[in-house]
Amino acid sequence: MHFIYDCSLFLFKIVIVIFFIIFVSSIILKISRKKNKNFGILSVSSLNDHYELVKNSIIVQLMDKKTKKLWNKKNKMLKRSTLLTNNNKLIDKDHNIIVVRAQPTLYVIDFKGGIAAHEVKSLREEISSIISVAQKHDEVLLRLESSGGTIHGYGLAAVQLQRLRSRKIFLTISIDKIATSGGYMMACVANYIIATPFSIIGSIGVVAQFPNIHKFLKKNNIDVELHTAGVHKRTLTIFGENTPEDRKKFVEELNVAHDLFKKFVKTMRPSLNIEKLSNGECWFGSIALKKKLVDDINTSDDFIISRIRKFNILHVKFKYNESIIKALFYKKLKTINNLIYKYLNNKLF
């Protein structure tokens, strides 16, 4: 009797805990939905201020106590909050104009792309915001990191960058780590490409792979029916039997995509020997420079620092609002999603 009572009490506690978790989760979801009325936030920060702060932090540590005291006193006197307006003028908190900005602006944006290129959602907002305020002599630096992915995803990302070129906004793309396949499709849109010596560049090709378990299913007496309206609605399948005709058609589709890729790169960088470079091979940055795939060997950091005196440098980042639940599991979901695209989806750049 005692045992039954203890078991019942234990089960009752479990039920209470489950109901509590459901209750708390529902409250969190309601709060997150209310917060998500605005679909995202555009943050703009000054990299001039960032590098100045870093420099001053080191300078202060090198001072003796007396000099440090004078520095801090002078720093407090010089502090005055300023804001940047759309017509490129600096104003104080009372909306009084202090000084007209004479320098052009270098807008810095980042793109770290996955296989599905979902990051293009933020990229398009960042580019739209820059286009809306950019003036003559303003430039854009895109810090790119991507090993490529779906054709439609990276095709859209490359076209988004073309919006800057079509408006005569000078675009520099820096590759600190990797820009291959669809990543290089984006990079080639730039007016000027810089890369680090050991970054990985190239892979102008198309690949597609996924398993076929038809023999396994047949061995276990499992039938799969696939019905299509249209001869080439589905070429290769995972579960069904793939015929030589299906494979031939699939390879044709790969070649069509490859030809489009080659033409796009050649249009953006006419000096390339595209037939020689479009075999899917990758090169280190220093070798890619000799093959004219990039224009200079440099890091994005040095590129920015070299322009601090000539440009007002702003880092622009658009972030979509997400529910708390989605934010907690986003990385895991992204990994699973990339695996699905890699092994079960169609052709990839």
From Swiss-Prot:
Q: Which Pfam families match?
A: Peptidase_S49, Peptidase_S49_N
State its location(s): Cell membrane
Instruction: State the active site.
Output: S181, K233
Using the record, list the residue span of the signal peptide; answer none if the entry has no such feature: none
- State the UniProt keywords alphabetically: Cell membrane, Hydrolase, Membrane, Protease, Serine protease, Transmembrane, Transmembrane helix
Q: CDD domains, alphabetically?
A: S49_Sppa_N_C
Q: Which GO terms describe its cellular component?
A: plasma membrane
Q: Domain of life, per the record? A: Bacteria
- Principal place of residence: membrane
Ranges that cross the membrane: 10-29, 188-210
Task: Note the topology in the membrane.
Answer: Multi-pass membrane protein
Q: Name one GO biological process term.
A: proteolysis
| EC annotation from Swiss-Prot or TrEMBL | 3.4.21.-
Give the enzyme's main class according to its UniProt record, as a single word: hydrolase
GO function term, MF aspect, one? serine-type endopeptidase activity
Role according to the record: Possible protease.
Family membership: Belongs to the peptidase S49 family.
What is the name listed in the Swiss-Prot or TrEMBL entry for this protein?
Putative protease SohB
In the record, what lineage is assigned to the organism producing the protein? Bacteria, Pseudomonadati, Pseudomonadota, Gammaproteobacteria, Enterobacterales
The gene for this chain is sohB
